[in-house]
From Swiss-Prot:
Recorded superkingdom: Bacteria
Function of the protein: Component of the sulfite reductase complex that catalyzes the 6-electron reduction of sulfite to sulfide. This is one of several activities required for the biosynthesis of L-cysteine from sulfate.
Native species: Aliivibrio fischeri (strain MJ11) (Vibrio fischeri)
Family matches, as PANTHER family: SULFITE REDUCTASE [NADPH] SUBUNIT BETA, SULFITE REDUCTASE [NADPH] SUBUNIT BETA-RELATED
EC number(s) from the headed UniProt entry: 1.8.1.2
Gene3D superfamilies from the UniProt entry: Sulfite Reductase Hemoprotein, domain 1
Enzyme class: oxidoreductase
Pfam families in alphabetical order: NIR_SIR, NIR_SIR_ferr
Cofactor(s) demanded: siroheme; [4Fe-4S] cluster
Protein name per Swiss-Prot or TrEMBL: Sulfite reductase [NADPH] hemoprotein beta-component
SUPFAM superfamilies: Nitrite and sulphite reductase 4Fe-4S domain-like (SSF56014), Nitrite/Sulfite reductase N-terminal domain-like (SSF55124)
A GO biological-process term: hydrogen sulfide biosynthetic process
InterPro entries: CysI (IPR011786), NiRdtase/SiRdtase_haem-b_fer (IPR005117), Nit/Sulf_reduc_fer-like_dom_sf (IPR036136), NO2/SO3_Rdtase_4Fe4S_dom (IPR006067), NO2/SO3_Rdtase_4Fe4S_prot (IPR045169), NO2/SO3_Rdtase_4Fe4S_sf (IPR045854), NO2/SO3_Rdtase_FeS/sirohaem_BS (IPR006066)
Note on how the cofactor is bound: Binds 1 siroheme per subunit. Binds 1 [4Fe-4S] cluster per subunit.
Amino acid sequence: MSELIDVKTILSGTELGPLADNERLKRESKHLRGTIVEDLQDRITGGFTKDNFQLIRFHGMYQQDDRDIRAERAKQKLEPLHNVMLRARMPGGIITPKQWLAIDKFAEEHTSYGSLRLTTRQTFQFHGVLKPNIKLMHQTLNSIGIDSIATAGDVNRNVLCTTNPVESELHQEAYEWAKKISEHLLPKTRAYAEIWLDGEKLETTDEEPILGSNYLPRKFKTTVVIPPQNDVDVHANDLNFIAIADNGKLVGFNVLVGGGLAMTHGDTATYPRKADDFGFVPLKKTLEVAAAVVTTQRDWGNRSNRKNAKTKYTLDRVGSDVFKAEVEKRAGVQFEESRPYELTERGDRIGWVEGIDGKHHLALFIENGRLLDYPGKPLKTGVAEIAKVHQGDFRMTANQNLIVAGVPSEQKDHIEQIARAHGLIDDTHSEQRKNSMACVAFPTCPLAMAEAERFLPEFVTEIEGVLKKHNLPEEDNIIFRVTGCPNGCGRAMLAEIGLVGKAPGRYNFHLGGNRSGTRVPKMYKENITDRQILTEIDHLVGRWAIERNENEGFGDFTIRAGIVDEVKVSKRDFHA
C-alpha cells in the first residue's frame, strides 16, 4: 500500500515539474467552453485565437490551413487560409446510407476539398471547413445522429471495433460494447450542445466523475478486438478489450493496457510501445475496468511533460504491476489469467465475403482513405450511388477502407455494377498496394514534416517493381506504412517497413515489425531520401527473396538475418 501512496505523492506533487500550460487551459476553460462562441463571431480572422485553438479539439476539430499556399498568402500580407478538420465520433465505424448521403452532400457543398477522408481511427473526416460553415457542420451532423464530441483532445477518443461482418452475431455484440464504452467515457459537459447546437445554457457544475475537472493528461485510445483479426492494431492503443467467445457468444475480454506509437524526434525518453496484457474480465465488469484504467491514468499520468503524458509512459514509470493493482482496486475486480487467443491478420478482406447470416459484404479498397472524384474514377460519387440503393449499412475500417455490409443476394450484382462503374473495384490493385497505408500529412496537417498520403501511391508502384524484379509472387508483399511526422497516425511503428517523416523528402526508415502487428520495428536508417530508401528496399528484398525460410515474412526475415535487432522492451531496446 505504501508503494501506491508514494506513487500518488509523486504524481500529484512537484517532483515531475510544474504543470504544462495545457493544464491551466483546461482548468480555466469552463468545462471546454472557453470563448469559442466569441471567436465564432469574429470575422476579422478565419481562425480561433489563444486557448480556443486547443479547446476546439475537445469538440472534434483541429485548426489547419492549406500549407501549399501559405507562403503565397504571406507574400500578399494575408493570414494563412485557416479552416478546420472535423473527425466524427462513430464507435465501430458503422454508418447508415442515409447518414452517408448527408455527409457526402456536406463535403461537396461546404468543404474546400470536396472530399471525405476515411481514417485509421475508423471514422471519417471533413477537411477544409471555413469558419462560417462550422456551426452548420455540427448541426448537419446532429440532424442525422452523429457528433464529434471527444474525437480529439485529452479524452477517450473514438472507440474502434474489429470490422468482422462474417461472424455477424459476435460482431454485433462487440460493436454494442464499443458503443457502451464510448458513451461511458464521454465528457459530461454540455459545452458541445450549447455552442454548436444552440442548446439551452443550464446552471450546472458539469461534474466529470471519470475524466475529472482537468480531463486526462493526454489523448487516450480504446479498441474492441475480435481475434484473429487485428485490423485496429491493438498495440497502438491505450486500452484494448480482446473479445473472448464461448460457442460463438461473447463471455468477456482480455484487457491490454499501455500501447501507443507516438514519439518525438531526438527525444530518447519517447518511444512506441506495445500494450501489456492485464488478464481476463467477465462482461459484467467491462465498464468498471474501462473507467478504472482511465481514472488511474487520469490521476497518475504526467501532467508536467506532455511528451511523456500517455498511459504507456505511466506504466513504464510506476510499473505495470502497480498500475494493474490500482485498476483492480478501483474496479473491484481481480483479473483472471488471460484466455487463449491469437492475432494472425490485420488487412481487410477486399472483395465479397458471405456472412453466417447469408448476407453479403463488399470490402472496397480506398487508397489512403481519400474519397474524391478523380479523373476516370469518381469514387465519392460511386459510394453515394451505392448509398441510394443499399439496404444494409457501411462500415469504415481502421485500414481506411469501406465495407458495404448486409447486402442481400438479389442486390449483390447491382451493387457490384455500381462499384465497378465508378472505379471502386479495380482488379489491377496489387496485394502490396492493399497492404500499404499513409496518414494525411501535407497540405492540411500542421504537424507534417514530410509527405505521406500524396507520396505513397507512386512509391508503392516502385515497391511493386522491386518485388517483381526479384520474382516474388503477389502473396509475398510487405506491410508498408508512411506517417508524415512522429505522432504516428499512419501507424508506421507497427509495419514491416515504416517511414516516419523527418523533413520534406526525407524519412526515418524502420524495419522489423511483423504482419500481425505484434512487434515494434526499429530504426534502420535515419533521415534519408526516398531514393535512398528505395535503393535499400531493393537490396533488402533481394536478400529476402533468396535467403528467407519457407513462409517467412519480410519483417521476420530482417530480425532473423540480423539486419535490425528485435524490439522486445521498447524503453530499453527501441533507441539502443
